[in-house]
Design a protein with these regions (language model features):
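Hot-dog-fold acyl-thioester-processing enzymes
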Residues: 2-70, 129-207
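Long, charged, glycine-rich C-terminal linkers/tails
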Residues: 211-215
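Short, surface-exposed, charged/polar-biased interaction segments
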Residues: 179-182, 218, 222
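HotDog/MaoC-like acyl-thioester-processing domains
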Residues: 2-8, 72-150, 220-266
Length: 266
């Protein structure tokens, strides 16, 4: 995918049931939470591990003084994704000097819409990554937000996630590269980081399922570094049964690593 033209890809077997179950177990384990009540919020992103998708992604090439980072992830769920069911993906890409944006619209064999994924990647100056300092948010600034317990992600869990997701970016696995960039350890993948929103969301609003998620990634979190998830409930979306929420991933220094706006439905 090198331009804005759509490309249709049949995905026999769709979302792999084994990978989906393994991701659910991994998220609950790292979050120190009960088993997930529903399909992992980020399960549709596991389709990036599909060989047919990998062959067509045409990822941006980072120069020697650049690193490829994820800026944004959006997911819109139109109906439940059933692991193992055949899917068709209509994909498009927009490439520019600073990175790339991808859109995947997922449908069943009959053409019924199931989900849409939007991803934005950016080529970032490698020497600047360790110096990124996003805003601080102290707990008292978030009012009556629900807070997770402290979470840290060991490299072994990152490696498991990389195997499930097909993410081959060395920033997540290469300790030497991380050290050369001034980082304490490889970086936790952004999608894995925001997966930790689901356990606290299900605890606050049991029996709900994801309708949409829009996440922005602001700073790297290294393996074994502590963070917490803060979840704010923001009422109902007009004309729907959707609950609006905002989630923050916040490091031990109170700096915001990622922000996600969600809607969940009963």
């Amino acid at each position: 995918m090198t331009g804005a033209d759509d490309m249709t890809m049949p995905l026999p077997g769709g979302l792999d049931a084994g990978r989906t179950a393994a991701l659910a177990d991994l998220v609950a384990q790292i979050a120190g939470a009960a088993p997930l009540q529903s399909l992992p919020y980020l399960a549709p992103a596991l389709l990036f591990a599909n060989a047919s998708v990998q062959d067509r992604l045409d990822m941006p090439h980072a120069a020697a003084d650049q690193i490829l980072v994820q800026e944004y992830q959006g997911i819109t769920c139109l109906c439940a994704v059933i692991p193992g069911a055949d899917l068709v993906a209509t994909a498009s890409a927009q490439h520019k000097a600073s990175g790339a944006a991808y859109r995947f619209a997922l449908a069943d064999r009959d053409g019924n819409g199931i989900a849409q994924l939007d991803t934005a990647l950016r080529l970032f100056p490698a020497d600047d990554l360790a110096a990124v300092k996003p805003m601080r948010l102290r707990p008292d600034m978030l009012g009556d937000a629900d807070w997770s317990d402290e979470i840290s992600v060991p490299q072994s869990a990152i490696d498991t996630y990389l195997a499930l997701s097909g993410d081959g970016n060395p920033i997540h696995s290469d300790a030497r590269q991380a050290a050369a960039l001034g980082l304490a350890a490889p970086v936790v993948p952004g999608l894995f980081l925001i997966s930790m929103i689901q356990p606290i969301c299900e605890a606050a609003l049991p029996g709900t399922a994801l309708a949409s998620l829009k996440a922005r990634f602001l700073a790297p979190l290294c393996a074994d570094q502590a963070f917490r998830i803060a979840l704010q409930q923001r009422g109902r979306a007009a004309g729907t049964d959707h609950h609006k929420l905002r989630a923050y991933a916040i490091g031990s220094d109170d700096r915001v690593l990622a922000i996600a706006d969600l809607q969940v439905q009963s």
